[in-house]
Amino acid sequence: MTAPITLPPPTRQALCPYAVLAVLAMCWPAISLAEDEYTFPLGPEHTPTKLQMSHAMAHPPTYIAANPTIQPSPTTIRMTYESLSLPAGEKMGMLGGDLLINVNDHLRLGVGTYGALTGERGGFITLGVEGELQQRINQAWLSHAGLFVGAGGGRGGYTLSGGGLMLRGDMGITYESKSYGNIGFGVSHVRFPSGIITSTQPYIQYEYPFNILLASGWADTPSLDSQIRLDPVQASANEFALVGRNYQFSASALRDDGKPQSSSMQLVGVEWLSYLNDRWFVKVESEGAMGGENNGYMQILLGGGYRLPITRSTSLKMHATAGPAGGGGADTGGGLLLDAGLGLQQNMSKNMALELSLGAVTAPSHSFEALSLGLKLNYQFGLPNVTSTAVSWNALGDFDTEQLRMRLANQTYFKADPNWRNRSINQEVSNLGVQVDYFISPHWFMTGQGLAAYAGDAGAYMTGEVGLGTHWDLSKSWFIEGEGLVGAAGGGGLAVGGGLVAQANASLGYRLSDALSIMATAGYIEAPQGDFKANVAGISLAYQLTGFTAK
């Protein structure tokens, strides 16, 4: 016998958990819609689109036993700060950022990054994967122990980080507040096995918990009972953008060795926004140098802003961000970079927009200062705003399922040009990172990857690329793929010129289960503006997921 259940009121807007997966959710617009035919993607009144119930559905829903559901996954965005002890009494303040998903009540897995924020090592940045065990002490307190395995380096990275492998273990406790997130503290130990950094220090951290709706594997929509009324699920507004920037430096800007800074630098990267309400948003962005004389420069900025509608399809956006930045000889001091600016966004279709931004960036502790001109291609979409309560498939009729895939990847570079690097020219370079794929059809996918060197005497080398791939099944278990990518790379003594790189890969994959696959890859990467040319051999572990976006 069924019983009516009254749903709780909608909770606060959850931050978008697809900071990594959203890099693949875009396509070029086909046409520009006329003003009188245009429906603004965030709603005609410039508010985030919400899934509305009809008048007949305005009462709490009734469930039956056969109603299939999806259990949302508890997820956390975590920020950590600690100060590492370097040789000769030097200190390096590091800011960490992690995205963690609960596998069960005791285990969390995710991806993360650490970047220098204070000291004299601006641009020292690492990327990697994170695992954490946790045990509840009481209703408000948790104990935890974690391990981060990553790769990277930066200013002085060759000496400090060696090949680039970073290991970080930590133990601590966390206090869970009901309304303001979680506060934690503990002790961590950081080691670069092939470098000279070995440091134990206290840390503090802040966590923002929320829930995301993902299904393991590529789930098919089950058969649904049309008599079951829909849950009042809402869609939260989000944006993802491909970004191109030009920095025009001030006359007083210098390089970190005291020599004059070149007049400009070009960057490429990605940006993700999540709206807290109809006007305010938070955002994170990451870019790397691909032109100029600062190859190896990278920035990861976090902040927020305000969107002011001008017409139904035009908006003015204001933002302010801060985060770690540096490398490539840029004089960012300890690494803290501040950025503020204005943007004019023009929608060209229901989901696509172009944005022109103008701003200023500065490193408060040193001479790095520039005007920033940016061009962005935005993709706008809605995600289910859910709590910890199981969600009925019947509630998702106004959402499309999206096929997603995350790959934990190892790629090794082998010399294809005698001048491909400035030291250890006969030694291969091994890289660790994450690749994310968004399937736009059964045979085509958008892809993005972020990799950093962990072995091969190339500590501080990093690359971030986006591109297009194709997938074809050979049998039920075997498949082949091809992909082409372009992006930015630098550091570690690899001769990438201004930083622009292009890569092509071919892969053979085997399905271990409905969700898990293993892939072997062969490819080629080169820098059009430099002597860097390398053959690529890789292996990756791929996990398939189903996500949901508003129709």
Question: Residue locations for each model-derived region?
Answer:
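N-terminal signal peptide c-region/cleavage motif recognized by signal peptidases
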Residues: 27-29
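Transmembrane beta-strand segments of Gram-negative outer membrane beta-barrel proteins
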Residues: 65-83, 107-109, 143-147, 230-250, ...
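Hydrophobic, lipid-facing positions within transmembrane beta-strands of outer-membrane proteins
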Residues: 75-77, 93-97, 113, 125-131, ...
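Solvent-exposed loop/turn segments connecting transmembrane beta-strands
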Residues: 84-95, 116-127, 137, 155-165, ...
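Gram-negative (and chloroplast) outer-membrane scaffold detector with strong preference
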Residues: 98-157, 271-330, 433-501, 548
